[in-house]
Amino acid sequence: MRSPLARPGASPRAPDLRDVEALVRERGLSLGLPLHVEAEAGSTNDLAKSAARDGAPHGSVWLAESQTAGRGRQGRVWSSPRGENLLFSVLLRPGGAMPLARLPELSLVVGLAVRDAAAKAVGDAAGRLRVKWPNDVVALEGDALAGATDGARPRWRKLAGVLLESQITGSGARAKVDALIVGVGLNVHTRSFPGELGSTATSLALLRAAGAPAEELSRAAVLVDVLEGLHRDVAFVAERGLGLVHARLTAADALRGQRVLAEGPTACPTAYPSACPTWEGTCEGIDLEGKLLVRGDDGVLRRVSSGEVHLGSSGSR
């Protein structure tokens, strides 16, 4: 039965999405089938959550050409022109009763998979595509890429956002992750963004390097590259942690070495968050539990597990 969250009638498959199933089978991936493509949906994450409750299998994917209620972290709206980009959700069933403590680590792994697929699509030999904790994918610009040392904050544009939502069984110490919904919004073909997005967003089409493959950007290829990254890393990290991917994550970390402004209760260095809405420090990387390491101006190193971390009023959020 079709979810009431979707509009009647699956989307006629766009030319650059026709090969998804064939590529998934060709690469022997555990993710990507079945694939549900909708012309329009409220939110692909909502479709996936509803289906997960009804027993949909691990690896199922929901993709929409347009969303009317797309959202990102902290309830932000994610907008995208119809038929230009990738708006999809993947249902993961980690198995083995994955503990809740692994969720921050898996969030980073998803961001890394999206970054790696995007870098392949645009021929990013210079390493300008980075993961901004906890899982946004951004493209460094100008002096930021060259490693400017004049004290200016780096500049980047957002390429992709990730939203993870989980379904939990048990409670307290017995709580485990039964299903994990991975929602991704990745700008592919869009070349013009409205309003303030014109100065803060980018797309694969805009980033494509001169040395990139000559063929047209294929959303199918990019999607399957993301799925391949998740196929490679998710099960391992769910069971054993970030260990083997930590070096790759460190190399792609957009915040490491930067002055950052932290907001939120777990980013506050006092026992009274209401008295400390923001604080500043220098990011020293990401630890093996997926927490951001920030050394405050008082010299104390703190591990940030949630909240908002950005570069302050003069930098990119």
Region spans (language model):
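Conserved, helical-rich catalytic subdomain that frames metal- and/or nucleotide-binding sites
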Residues: 209-279, 315-317
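Short, low-complexity Ser/Thr-rich regulatory SLiMs
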Residues: 141, 163-170
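Structured surface patches comprising rigid loops and adjacent beta-strands/short helices at the edges
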Residues: 289-291, 297-317
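Short, conserved beta-turn/loop elements at beta-strand boundaries and strand-helix junctions
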Residues: 167-168, 191, 286-292
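Short beta-strand-centered aromatic/proline hotspots
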Residues: 279-286
